[in-house]
């Protein structure tokens, strides 16, 4: 509720994992006075990465990406963050906890997150997602190396050609997700 927010000491972080309970999302959105258009974007999980400024905070949409190695497909989970004066509300599309290690650090009092404001927590959450992109790039590199080895041993096998096209599609999908994020992150750093 707004009263809880105003009377709370320190930083409040509400993390919603899974977007299936729309009533809960609406309740939290109303309690933290999150703009209705931002809440609509939370529930519409096909948003491009973006940063929007509202009177009472910043709204960030980004994507947690991972590689489905078996099918050579890029899997995307939308993450939305709303950072206000003394609070951050994060919305994770999937029930898996993308921010588990950040939560552990805050609960154990490690690092600066609890001592800093909502902007620092939002930065840490965004940084966590971006760090995952390096893992994704390592996985893509591994696939390229395996593909090179496959080409040397099997020649121009049809399965090898199919994997080349699959990998090219993954790289293009990654680039498509990365470009809007670059712009949003640049705007985020300028608002600090």
Where are these regions (language model features)?
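Peripheral, non-transmembrane regulatory/ligand-interaction domains of membrane transport proteins
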Residues: 1-192
